[in-house]
Regions:
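Acidic, turn/loop-rich segments in luminal/extracellular domains of secretory-pathway
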Residues: 1-73, 77-88, 92-171, 176-180
Length: 180
């Protein structure tokens, strides 16, 4: 049962020594590693036994990519003119996700901020009108949206969609044959 001292040393392969530290017989990261930022770390370690005999080796630590939830959910537009046709695109969703190739499924969900979910629908990554939206009836429609990736990570956001008032054509005007 020989005692050994272990240390990080400069030399070939020590490029990432500053990101790690040794405590006792264990190696620790100074901060949480992130596969998307840096997938592997190169370090050089020296081991010295009680008799002073030492050896040095270069090591590569390869991180495993773990799927992470999106950090925010956005929509490309939050306003639309009133009385547009059904299935008119209001906006397109985008999930900011550290996993750049992650696919998202968007759905409307109940809860706080879902008061207008029944007037809107989602097709793929697009928010569409499901009825003719009328500024005079309501000038803000609130929808609650869930983005879920293929492993089940979820993020929910509420969007307030402003309905722009459009000058409606006059109606109910009857021409008269008499002038005065």
């Amino acid at each position: 049962n020989d005692n050994h001292s272990i240390s990080l040393v400069p030399g070939d392969g020590s490029e990432d020594n500053d990101a790690l530290l040794i405590g006792g017989q264990k190696l620790y990261f100074k901060s949480n590693p992130d596969f998307e930022a840096k997938p592997n770390y190169s370090l050089r370690i020296r081991v010295v036994d009680a008799g002073g005999i030492s050896t040095e080796n270069k090591f590569i630590i390869n991180l495993i990519d773990i799927n992470e939830a999106g950090t925010s959910l956005e929509i490309s537009a939050q306003q639309i003119d009133e009385n547009v046709d059904l299935n008119t695109v209001v906006g397109q969703f985008k999930t900011n996700d550290p996993d750049t190739n992650d696919q998202q499924v968007y759905t409307l969900v109940s809860g706080k901020g879902a008061s207008s979910n029944n007037l809107i629908l989602i097709s793929g990554d697009k928010l569409l009108t499901n009825t003719q939206l009328n500024h005079k009836a309501n000038d803000i429609y609130s929808v609650r949206t869930l983005a879920e990736d293929l492993v089940g990570n979820k993020i929910v956001s509420v969007f307030d969609i402003k309905i722009n008032d459009v000058n409606d054509a006059p109606s109910g005007i009857q021409p008269s044959s008499s002038l005065q």
